[in-house]
Amino acid sequence: MPTLGVNIDHVATVRQARRTVEPDPIAAAVLAELAGAEGITAHLREDRRHIQDRDVRLLRQTVRTRLNLEMAATDEMVAIALDIRPDYVTLVPERREEVTTEGGLNVVGQRDRLALVVDQLQSAGIPVSLFIDAEPDQIAASAAIQAQWIELHTGRYAEAETEAAQAQELAALRQGCEQAIAAGLRVNAGHGLTYWNVYPVAQLPGMEELNIGHTIISRAVLVGLERAVREMKLAMQGKL
């Protein structure tokens, strides 16, 4: 079974709604780890809409599992990553007008730039994952620029409106896993996963980690964060 990385961005979203000091995403990360999360994910966006620089620095000091820093492939973010030294970095696309990340990186179209960033980070001992759609050309390009990981974008699977459409998207994810592993890549997945749709993705052969945030934080509002994390662990095992 894959491990669970808990994305704490939306704890920071609530805090930033009032520009105050609570709830603190650092405290949320501690509680998530105590409840069984094997990793903590935070996305430091260029517009700083939720996670702040202060959060990333404190997370690096406090996270005892693995810290996954999601970021755009910009010079500013590379400098921050080289300074903070997360356990690994996930490169994601960003548009200021988007509500959340809308799709995977276009590795094919940005190959030279992404190859440079991957080399900068991995030469410094920071493994890099690329957040991509489960498309053969994007997977091949990710392997070609020597990223260690990919994170398959599960948004289309999560948003499928019929069982047939969901089955089709799950098959694409399965094929993506197989292709990536054959190319020497390690595979994570995330985006839009919930307690009700996570189990089939968790069962994909070779899947190593699922990064999940919004549904856990939404559940935590009602039942508390520790219970919400424990329930997600059960859901990943098909036991919820």
Swiss-Prot record:
KW Kinase (keyword) present: no
Binding site residues for 3-amino-2-oxopropyl phosphate: 7, 18, 192, 213-214
Protein's organism: Synechococcus elongatus (strain ATCC 33912 / PCC 7942 / FACHB-805)
Domain of life: Bacteria
Family per similarity comment: Belongs to the PNP synthase family.
Keyword tags: Cytoplasm, Pyridoxine biosynthesis, Transferase
Protein name as it appears in the record: Pyridoxine 5'-phosphate synthase
Record-linked NCBIfam families: pdxJ (TIGR00559), PRK05265.1-1 (NF003623), PRK05265.1-3 (NF003625), PRK05265.1-5 (NF003627)
Any one GO biological process: pyridoxine biosynthetic process
CDD domains named in the record: PNPsynthase (cd00003)
Annotated compartments: Cytoplasm
Protein task: Catalyzes the complicated ring closure reaction between the two acyclic compounds 1-deoxy-D-xylulose-5-phosphate (DXP) and 3-amino-2-oxopropyl phosphate (1-amino-acetone-3-phosphate or AAP) to form pyridoxine 5'-phosphate (PNP) and inorganic phosphate.
GO CC terms: cytosol
